[in-house]
Swiss-Prot record:
Binding site for CTP: 8, 11, 91, 137, 140
Chain sites annotated for binding ATP: 8, 11, 91, 137, 140
Entry's EC annotation: 2.7.7.72, 3.1.3.-, 3.1.4.-
Requisite cofactors: Mg(2+); Ni(2+)
Name of protein: Multifunctional CCA protein
CDD domains: HDc (cd00077), NT_ClassII-CCAase (cd05398)
Key words of the record: ATP-binding, Hydrolase, Magnesium, Metal-binding, Multifunctional enzyme, Nickel, Nucleotide-binding, Nucleotidyltransferase, RNA repair, RNA-binding, Transferase, tRNA processing
Miscellaneous remark of the record: A single active site specifically recognizes both ATP and CTP and is responsible for their addition.
Binding site for Mg(2+): 21, 23
Domain of life where this protein originates: Bacteria
Residues covered by the HD domain: 228-329
Cofactor stoichiometry and binding remark: Magnesium is required for nucleotidyltransferase activity.
GO biological process, one term: tRNA 3'-terminal CCA addition
Length: 407
């Protein structure tokens, strides 16, 4: 029985990145061997065991054979005669198919170390095309490792395009698509994930609302990059510099969905694209069962992101109505979230990347001033029901008027 460190831990070790989770493969053993040594079996579909002390995952070397459609249609074979090379061959990318022995030696039959040096994401074998989830996984790895200069090997991109054209992506469940997308949104360069999906044709199948933005022009005066799809990718790149909050990042991605359904005869103008985008955001979020908290913010971002660009010119009464509309009194965190989204929208344009966004400062400060109005003093006047609401709104307007007069 031989044990090897495999997968992401070996890859990250070679990249001098922090190693988070360690996975091990066991060659030349049976389930009984590991159970006798105190390992606990956790895998139902294939033999995975938890180490009795470290609780790290140890899997028996196995092969997988395509036996059905989708990413679940595989028959697993695990036995003592499965070699390390057999096990590594079923993995997706060469950089994930390197093993590290107890003697401190790398076993690299598919030249993953060469690809790490060349900064290439390359598939191990043609069996890659048997699992449609790998299209998303490679796009996610591209996003994760883009800051290190990694790109996808041309032959792997061709294979991803073939897989997309085959219709296999339709077998992916909502949960798996969102899980990969969520991980990508946590990466340093999430826009790369969507750019890769667009490049291989998967965006049209999985995220048609986002795909529809590519090729849609916006006025050059406001958008030197012109193409709304390119602008959206720039916004996602910018918002990722401003926050790690996945709800904010996803909402920034969805802020202009309404432009994807503007009639061609109205191009390059998109009047009312904010409210138009709300049902598109709703549909996307329902399809992938995206958490309500993310969905609600994304709908608000679609509807109101343009309001913040002109917040300094708004009447105080309209500013208060905006705070009401986004439920800011009960959810004050939305102020900062929407300010960041609108800032990313303003700066996610060619030539505007380093410009300040004073509207964000104004928006935050206006809320702070309005929120300082004492509700108890209004209630103590003996007002009832809607009269309290009206008086509170008026008082908040006055507070903003007085504050603006001092600016």
């Amino acid at each position: 029985m031989k044990i090897y460190l495999v997968g992401g831990a070996v890859r990250d070790q070679l990249l001098n990145l922090p190693v988070k989770d360690r996975d091990w493969v066991v060659v030349g053993a049976t389930p009984e061997t590991l159970l006798q040594q105190g390992y606990q079996q956790v895998g139902k579909d294939f033999p995975v065991f938890l180490h009795p002390d470290t609780h790290e995952e140890y899997a028996l070397a196995r092969t997988e054979r395509k036996s059905g459609s989708g990413y679940t249609g595989f028959t697993c074979y695990a036995a003592p005669d499965v070699t390390l090379e057999d096990d590594l061959q079923r993995r997706d990318l060469t950089i994930n198919a390197i093993a590290y022995s107890a003697k401190g030696e790398y076993i690299d039959p598919y030249h993953g170390i060469d690809d790490i040096h060349a900064k290439l994401l390359r598939h191990v074998s043609d069996a890659f095309s048997e699992d449609p989830l790998r299209v998303l996984r490679v796009a996610r790895f591209a996003a994760r490792f883009a800051p290190l200069g990694f790109t996808i090997a041309p032959e792997t991109m061709s294979l991803m395009q073939e897989m997309t054209n085959s219709g296999e992506l339709n077998a992916l469940t909502a949960e798996r698509v969102w899980k990969e997308t969520e991980k990508a949104l946590h990466s340093q360069a999430p826009q790369v994930y969507f750019e890769i999906l667009h490049q291989c044709g998967a965006l049209k199948i999985l995220f048609p609302e986002i795909n529809a933005l590519f090729g849609v022009p916006a006025p050059k005066k406001w958008h030197p990059e012109i193409d709304t799809g390119i602008h959206t990718m720039m916004v996602l790149a910018m918002v990722s510099r401003l926050t790690d909050d996945i709800a904010v990042r996803f909402s920034a991605l969805c802020h202009d969905l309404g432009k994807g359904v503007t009639p061609v005869e109205n191009w390059p103008h998109h009047h009312g694209h904010g409210p138009t985008g709300v049902p598109l955001v709703e549909a996307l979020c329902q399809r992938y069962r995206i958490p309500n908290q993310i969905r609600d913010l994304a709908k608000l971002a679609a509807k109101y992101h343009d309001h913040l660009h002109r917040i300094e010119r708004m009447r105080p009464s309209k500013i208060i109505r905006l705070f009401d509309a986004i439920d800011a009194w009960r959810k004050p965190e939305r102020i900062d979230q929407l300010a960041i989204i609108s800032e990313a929208d303003a700066r996610g344009r060619q030539g505007s990347e380093n410009l300040p966004y004073p509207q964000g400062v104004f928006f935050r400060q206006a809320f702070k001033i309005a929120n300082q109005v004492d509700v108890k003093s209004i209630v103590s006047r003996g007002l009832k029901g809607s009269a309290i609401r009206e008086a509170l709104t008026k008082q908040r307007e006055v507070a903003i008027i007085e504050w603006k007069s001092r600016l």
